[in-house]
Amino acid sequence: MVLTLLFSAYKLCRFFTMSGPRPGADRLTVPGPDRSGGASPWWAAGGRGSREVSPGVGTEVQGALERSLPELQQALSELKQASAARAVGAGLAEVFQLVEEAWLLPAVGREVAQGLCDAIRLDGGLDLLLRLLQAPELETRVQAARLLEQILVAENRDRVARIGLGVILNLAKEREPVELARSVAGILEHMFKHSEETCQRLVAAGGLDAVLYWCRRTDPALLRHCALALANCALHGGQTVQRCMVEKRAAEWLFPLAFSKEDELLRLHACLAVAVLATNKEVEREVEHSGTLALVEPLVASLDPGRFARCLVDASDTSQGRGPDDLQSLVLLLDSSRLEAQCIGAFYLCAEAAIKSLQGKTKVFSDIGAIQSLKRLVSYSTNGTTSALAKRALRLLGEEVPRRILPCVASWKEAEVQTWLQQIGFSQYCENFREQQVDGDLLLRLTDEELQTDLGMKSSITRKRFFRELTELKTFASYATCDRSNLADWLGSLDPRFRQYTYGLVSCGLDRSLLHRVSEQQLLEDCGIRLGVHRTRILSAAREMLHSPLPCTGGKLSGDTPDVFISYRRNSGSQLASLLKVHLQLHGFSVFIDVEKLEAGKFEDKLIQSVIAARNFVLVLSAGALDKCMQDHDCKDWVHKEIVTALSCGKNIVPIIDGFEWPEPQALPEDMQAVLTFNGIKWSHEYQEATIEKIIRFLQGRPSQDSSAGSDTSLEGATPMGLP
């Protein structure tokens, strides 16, 4: 048996290790299964070649594996020999417990669990699980899927990608029961991390469809897996998969997950997924249109990354935090031009910094280049939430926190230029810049020749590094003092990199109204835009701008006239309200739903205006939805205000009923009692499509209003409100 041989080899290595290291040796080297030398045991290296493990950590890992491997060997042996369903279940449960306990070990849990997961694969346990996933007994499939989800480390994902994707996809097609769906969604969550090719295969074969279908469910664990599966799919699938996700309306289905009022982890994972999608310029507009992106920054601003980190540590499947590959994907978000991506990326990295500092593994952040990206956000970001999170992450990692760069670069004095040079690592040239009296204006107009001849930067590679930093500074700078036509934001809307050309253009006296008259040669010689492709794109967009009006208040009227206004009680109706929004959007309706991002002082006006503008008023009647309206004779409750406005404006009111108990008419204020004369539709989570079709008929045909409580005009299945 392979596991027996490996365990014997491990014991032999352990014996020689205890004899003491060779003089001068400061790391333990043990041959791996491929018989090549390595810097750690096979169970710690995970079969990916050798790596260094500190002696202290190595001893802890060795001790834990010495206790766990014999038990795992025995459990796997019994599982292979089991024939009855009950015996198979007992064997799966025992292996699952061993793996789960390993993941929960503080500090060394990842290495110990990695060793057990590798042992399961090497002894044929992974292949056995794939066979058990095809067993006729539902309970066996559920337990096997639950264990497989726990052991999908990188090498095991490789194996499943080669021989087991079909099995996983067949399970995904079942969709039910929820116990099986939880684990299958968790398996897909891990497999979406495997590679871009695997993501494409899973999406093409229905894996993404299954996850999106489960997004309409109510089980918290299932929804968390769905949110992370979509995030991993977006992070690792590449632009082709991201385009497919948007076409399948993933951004819309993420809305109810990000809108949840009960599960902060779920909301964060959903916000991560939609923020990643928004970084793809090809689909950015569609993602914005979904409305989900607007939830990201307010959510992140309201949460504490330390508390989030504790939640991750307390859960068995996230107790070790993210691995280096996952962290690398998050670093890419920091470098995005989208505020939402920077914000959510900084939050996750701050939480991961807290976890890694507890584990003593903060070096990984330097290895993946996260430190520089975090420092750049502190220096340049104008968003207070993002900057604060980046500062906190740097402090947790024991790094120096840089000073924030003043955004009005054109107004910098010589001292500010000196500070900037020091922060970007060019301190050796400070004296040269001081002698030449370089201020912000000169810095923004600096040329390669001047940098070489006048400022003494001889190395062409060093100059390239400098201009890379200068381009970043120009991109983040504020030009409000000299850019009267807001040329910077217009350039940024074409491509975030184009903001670097703002100062060169405005210094020549150009604004948006004159840009179309400029020649390509003038852009090159007078404005310093050296890249021909960039010149062509800017001129093309400037000439197109002549045929389209500049943004103005009047131009937003159509976007502020929704087909449907959804009124709901936050503490009990938010999930159903968000589901209704998605379903109606997918059927072509424009929908307004309050997402708690209205400007301070304008909350009431915005809500009332939206009710007045909407053609239909959908009232979500969840448990206790009207309780606060009772005795609210001053009309201070928001749901009360919305209902009264809808009634006074003669809106088509469509009540949706979910766990709602009817109040007596006299219990409600007189100004809203008329709402009880409308027919309601009972919501069915099991038959959502059928319920939505009925709602659409109500929206299109206005059959819900009923002047008498006993009217016979109610549709089949509709409930006349106010009647027993």
From Swiss-Prot:
<dbReference type="GO" id="GO:1905806">
    <property type="term" value="P:regulation of synapse pruning"/>
</dbReference>
<feature type="repeat" description="ARM 5">
    <location>
        <begin position="237"/>
        <end position="280"/>
    </location>
</feature>
<keyword id="KW-0399">Innate immunity</keyword>
<dbReference type="GO" id="GO:0035591">
    <property type="term" value="F:signaling adaptor activity"/>
</dbReference>
<keyword id="KW-0496">Mitochondrion</keyword>
<dbReference type="GO" id="GO:0048814">
    <property type="term" value="P:regulation of dendrite morphogenesis"/>
</dbReference>
<dbReference type="GO" id="GO:0099010">
    <property type="term" value="P:modification of postsynaptic structure"/>
</dbReference>
<dbReference type="GO" id="GO:0030154">
    <property type="term" value="P:cell differentiation"/>
</dbReference>
<feature type="region of interest" description="Disordered">
    <location>
        <begin position="703"/>
        <end position="724"/>
    </location>
</feature>
<feature type="domain" description="SAM 1">
    <location>
        <begin position="412"/>
        <end position="476"/>
    </location>
</feature>
<dbReference type="GO" id="GO:0034128">
    <property type="term" value="P:negative regulation of MyD88-independent toll-like receptor signaling pathway"/>
</dbReference>
<feature type="region of interest" description="Disordered">
    <location>
        <begin position="24"/>
        <end position="56"/>
    </location>
</feature>
<keyword id="KW-0963">Cytoplasm</keyword>
<dbReference type="Pfam" id="PF07647">
    <property type="entry name" value="SAM_2"/>
</dbReference>
<dbReference type="GO" id="GO:0030424">
    <property type="term" value="C:axon"/>
</dbReference>
<dbReference type="GO" id="GO:0098978">
    <property type="term" value="C:glutamatergic synapse"/>
</dbReference>
<keyword id="KW-0391">Immunity</keyword>
<feature type="domain" description="TIR">
    <location>
        <begin position="560"/>
        <end position="703"/>
    </location>
</feature>
<keyword id="KW-0809">Transit peptide</keyword>
<feature type="binding site">
    <location>
        <position position="599"/>
    </location>
    <ligand>
        <name>NAD(+) 2</name>
    </ligand>
</feature>
<feature type="binding site">
    <location>
        <position position="110"/>
    </location>
    <ligand>
        <name>NAD(+) 1</name>
    </ligand>
</feature>
<dbReference type="InterPro" id="IPR016024">
    <property type="entry name" value="ARM-type_fold"/>
</dbReference>
<feature type="repeat" description="ARM 3">
    <location>
        <begin position="155"/>
        <end position="193"/>
    </location>
</feature>
<feature type="repeat" description="ARM 7">
    <location>
        <begin position="315"/>
        <end position="354"/>
    </location>
</feature>
<feature type="repeat" description="ARM 2">
    <location>
        <begin position="114"/>
        <end position="153"/>
    </location>
</feature>
<dbReference type="InterPro" id="IPR039184">
    <property type="entry name" value="SARM1"/>
</dbReference>
<keyword id="KW-0677">Repeat</keyword>
<feature type="binding site">
    <location>
        <begin position="569"/>
        <end position="570"/>
    </location>
    <ligand>
        <name>NAD(+) 2</name>
    </ligand>
</feature>
<keyword id="KW-0770">Synapse</keyword>
<dbReference type="GO" id="GO:0019677">
    <property type="term" value="P:NAD catabolic process"/>
</dbReference>
<feature type="modified residue" description="Phosphoserine">
    <location>
        <position position="548"/>
    </location>
</feature>
<dbReference type="GO" id="GO:0031594">
    <property type="term" value="C:neuromuscular junction"/>
</dbReference>
<keyword id="KW-0221">Differentiation</keyword>
<dbReference type="GO" id="GO:0048678">
    <property type="term" value="P:response to axon injury"/>
</dbReference>
<keyword id="KW-0378">Hydrolase</keyword>
<dbReference type="GO" id="GO:0070585">
    <property type="term" value="P:protein localization to mitochondrion"/>
</dbReference>
<dbReference type="GO" id="GO:0007165">
    <property type="term" value="P:signal transduction"/>
</dbReference>
<keyword id="KW-0966">Cell projection</keyword>
<dbReference type="InterPro" id="IPR011989">
    <property type="entry name" value="ARM-like"/>
</dbReference>
<feature type="compositionally biased region" description="Low complexity">
    <location>
        <begin position="36"/>
        <end position="45"/>
    </location>
</feature>
<dbReference type="GO" id="GO:0032991">
    <property type="term" value="C:protein-containing complex"/>
</dbReference>
<dbReference type="GO" id="GO:0045202">
    <property type="term" value="C:synapse"/>
</dbReference>
